[in-house]
Regions:
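Residue-level recognition of transmembrane alpha-helices
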Residues: 10, 14, 42-45, 81, ...
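Alpha-helical transmembrane segments of multi-pass membrane proteins
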Residues: 50-54, 89, 94, 101-128, ...
């Protein structure tokens, strides 16, 4: 019965997410009414997607791999993942002069950085609950994220008419909404124990995930 209920829940989740996504695409074409604004938004989205695997060092793969291993301490896996993202984001901050060279990025740099950080943190939490086999929560989060993204688009693009800035802000807040929901609903907060940082495990996780970065980047090229 658990398998049937989980399968049904994932089917509903996938259908709902795809249905909402079906409305989002034409809505964006309408809301981002200027070709220039749409082009800038698309370029910034691609830049975000390229920066995410670099900033996170592909640690999402390691969280699943080492989180599923019952011999590993769950808190250590979570803290190691958070430390990796923190380190990567610090490097990104130091590289701000280089990132600002991306076409059209300088004007939107704070929002671009917010998007990258929000996405990395959301992935940290969602991959961690996947490693704990909280499949129902994963399915619920998928619908919540898509729905919140649509609502944020309506607010920032139709009501406030913020253009490319609103586009980035909507994506960042949708990821943050998902992250906060999963962090508390999935009990991730119970694993926030900095003293459980495991340097040996961290090296193993990096050896596993670093080779994944080129593949993640090539997906968006």
């Amino acid at each position: 019965t658990t398998l049937v209920s989980n399968t049904l829940l994932f089917a509903i989740s996938n259908f709902s997410s795809k249905l909402l996504s079906f409305f989002i695409r034409p809505y964006l074409s309408y809301a981002l009414d200027s070709p220039d604004v749409m082009g800038v938004s698309s370029l910034l989205q691609q830049a975000t997607n390229l920066l995410i695997p670099v900033v996170s060092l592909g640690v999402a793969y390691a969280i699943i791999r080492f989180g599923l291993d019952k011999e590993n301490d769950k808190a250590s896996v979570f803290v190691n993942g958070a430390a990796t993202i923190g380190l990567g984001f610090l490097v990104l901050l130091l590289a701000m002069p280089l990132v600002s060279l991306i076409p059209n990025a300088a004007e939107y740099l704070p929002f671009l950085y917010l998007c990258v950080l929000a996405s990395c943190l959301r992935t940290l939490c969602t991959q961690f609950i996947r490693s704990r086999m909280l499949n129902r929560l994963v399915a619920i989060d998928g619908v919540l994220t898509t729905l919140s993204l649509l609502l944020y688009y309506l607010l920032f693009l139709s009501v406030l008419r913020m253009g490319a800035t609103g586009f980035l802000l909507a994506n960042a807040l949708a990821d943050l909404t998902s992250m906060v929901f999963v962090f508390f609903a999935g009990g991730c907060w119970r694993y926030c124990k900095p003293k459980r940082f495991d340097r040996g495990l961290w090296r193993e996780m990096l050896r596993y995930c670093l080779p994944m970065i080129p593949a993640s980047i090539s997906f968006w090229i």
